[in-house]
Amino acid sequence: MNNVVLVGFMGSGKTTVGRELADRTGRPFIDLDDEIAADAGRSIADIFADEGEAGFRERESRGLEHALRQDDAIIAAGGGTPLRDENWREMRSGNCVVALTAEPAELARRLNRPKGRPLLQSDIPSTIAALLPTRMARYLEADLVFSTDGKPAAEISRHIDARLPRGGLHRISIDVPGAAHEVTVGFHLANLVAQALRRLAASRPIMVVSDSVAAGRHVDPLIEALKSAGISAAVHLVPAGEAAKELRALSTIYGALADEGIDREGVLVSLGGGSVGDVAGFAAATWMRGIRYVQVPTTLLAMVDSSIGGKTAINLPAGKNLAGAVHQPVAIFSDLEYLETLADAEFRSGLAEIIKVALVADRSFVDWLSVNLVALLGRDKPAMLEAVRRAVAIKAGVVSRDPHETGERAILNYGHTVGHALERAAGFGRLRHGEAVAWGMEVAGRLSLSSGAGTPEAVRTQHALLQRAGLLANRPEVKRADLWQALRHDKKSQAGALRFVLLREIGRADYGCEVDPNLVWDTLAKVLSL
């Protein structure tokens, strides 16, 4: 895991650059063809002669599987290795794939002595012309792509090293019918975002939507990464916080999209927290009846919650998120480097959603959090990577099974019935979402117990985690009447009845539970001291 896999056509420089990169980074180097030959006790040419290409490809897949068991290695794959879908999936699982390219004439010059290359025994330029187009389509799906034309291996390896993700890389699939996409989780991902946009947009226009807070920290590095990939993008800023989700902010995005000539083939990039993602996603959902967008969340809350699932919305005076649409992004990149400068209160707010998703879906994750919460609060990098990976994987699985929230996905609303009501009663923007959800979870946990649906162990465990995370330090100050009115406006209420997600036990929740309003009110009064 966390290997760098070099792919590219014969003669693109994988072995030479790979050795340079290994020397530069202090990592072991593995040449896949050399490993295959050593295992077989024969040259690659002899394997082709004795077993044919099909036999060689089977050996190649086995050799790749063995090589990928290494940690932090530089692996030079064969030119045809990534063409097998199963090989490609293995390469991308926890590893960074880097493609090296060269012009056909340069490849022909480098390959003029094709010793040991069984597929190059005939006319070399013709062979390149026949094989390269199909292979190039796969190479360009790599995380990073570098041309080796006219550049020394040391220079290429330096550029690769500067752009590699750091400290591990995870990809989580969200298999929504007709809109499947991935969440990439790691550190130092701006260059991976740039390459993805290069694939998606080609020469089409791109606009980055951010807010004043995120832009001040993160826009310039992203734009620089885009420029290094040969991409230009317009930048449009919306107000920070919940003000980003007002109709007037949405209107300014529409105006900027028009001014920049963003058409149906254009791409919108959301760079910011949950509010930016919500309004930018809603703009993408409605501009020209829907354009593609990429989520680049910069807060923990957005990484583990709002960026996943395609929910987009703006606020109205009558309530939070009342005007919205489900519009899936084409990719999500959660760069944990952004969390290093995140305010402590914002980081803790994101922890509420991590605790929530563990409580409703994965007891082992709850156990992990109980042990590792101190490290997580200290922003230990391996702890952050593991927590975000697990939280994203849980939500991605739920969304894949229920993309339109007609059933199971409702469990992700645990704590949100009261949480959203608290946000509205306090005034949007005055109470952080995670803090509101934490208190909403406290209420829902008590309701679970008092209604006979839950267990004392679950409520105690929840309370301990929320308290240790610093999420219960200050009770929200709201008026009783305002809170009750907000509850009645909740989207999950039906025919005036209050419906809750209740915690059945650690790792399991029930949704759509109708609760006696008197019990709700009594519990609110006790938990919130109303």
Q: For each predicted feature, which ranges?
A:
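A glycine/threonine-rich phosphate-anchoring loop and its flanking beta-alpha core
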Residues: 140, 282-375
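Conserved glycine(s) of the Walker
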Residues: 13
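A glycine- and Lys/Arg-enriched "phosphate-lid" helix/loop adjacent to the NTP-binding pocket
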Residues: 93-137
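ATP/NTP phosphate-donor binding region
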Residues: 168-267
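ATP-dependent small-molecule kinase phosphotransfer cores
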Residues: 28, 32-92, 116, 125
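C-terminal charged capping/lid subdomain of soluble metabolic enzymes
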Residues: 352-355, 453-530
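NTP-dependent small-molecule kinase module
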Residues: 16, 20, 24, 70, ...
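Active-site segments that bind and position negatively charged phosphate/pyrophosphate groups
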Residues: 368-481
